[in-house]
Amino acid sequence: MVNPQKINHFGKLEMAFEPRRGYTRLVHVYQQPPLKASRELYEGSDPTATVFLMESSGGMVAGDRNEINVKLASGSRVRLKQQSALKIYPSHTGDHCTQAITVEMADEARLEWLPEVTIPFERAKFQADTTIRMKESSTLIWGEIVAPGREMRGEVFDYQAYQSKYKVYVEEQLIAFDSIHFKPQEMNFAALGLLEKALYIGSLWIVSPLVKNLNMRDLQDLIQQEQSLQASVTKLTDQAIHCRWLAKEQRTLHKEINRMFEQMTALL
């Protein structure tokens, strides 16, 4: 159990990747607890560097802050995986805990951020800010899932506040801005146009020069294979699409968003 009286953490993780001798290498890393990155892992001759992101404190509490900065040099291929769900503990002081992620991608770089779950506990307050800056020739596949709380313990939208901002810039032009601001005590999530009967939200962002070759009707059919989910695909620009799911339970959503993630990595 996290001690609510603990000293606030300021986690910091800086990573820089570049191709060397046929593989993408993690050439610079700065780690400030509780954030930590694994060494690079590879699958056979695939030059993609897979790195696991770890949070050793077991979760974030009021006043904690995590900063993650990622830089990909030209031609880098990187897959980042969170080791576990991000747990947001109750705010006993009334302060938010915050997470800021900044990514810079050079020409023909490729980043895959695999989806993991953010779980805001009862009375939690959380703010997240993610900013991606990339080139027209680079590729981004990014997934994330937001839970209503510890559902198995009966915590469903019992947190105080959840706020996230997600921005993608291509050649310094803003092509995507997604803002979520939930205050369960002030909102009726069952209302038409909000979550209605859904509990979980899943998102997948795909930005690539190859998006223009994808058929939107085929993607719509692909994303709607699981009847228990509500899902849709939106074309943002000729090189960007956004997929969103609303789900009643986590396991099916996780399975479907990962299936779509792997489909996109294969197509792009």
Curated annotation (Swiss-Prot):
- Where in the cell? Cytoplasm
Q: What is this protein called in UniProt? A: Urease accessory protein UreD
The record's section on Pfam families has: UreD (PF01774)
Q: Which HAMAP family does the entry link to? A: UreD (MF_01384)
Q: Which residues form a coiled coil?
A: none
| Subunit annotation | UreD, UreF and UreG form a complex that acts as a GTP-hydrolysis-dependent molecular chaperone, activating the urease apoprotein by helping to assemble the nickel containing metallocenter of UreC. The UreE protein probably delivers the nickel.
Source organism, top-level taxon: Bacteria
Record-level GO cellular component terms: cytoplasm
Describe its function. Required for maturation of urease via the functional incorporation of the urease nickel metallocenter.
Keyword set, alphabetical order: Chaperone, Cytoplasm, Nickel insertion
- PANTHER family recorded for this chain? UREASE ACCESSORY PROTEIN D
Show the taxonomic lineage.
Bacteria, Bacillati, Bacillota, Bacilli, Bacillales
GO MF annotation list:
nickel cation binding
Similarity annotation: Belongs to the UreD family.
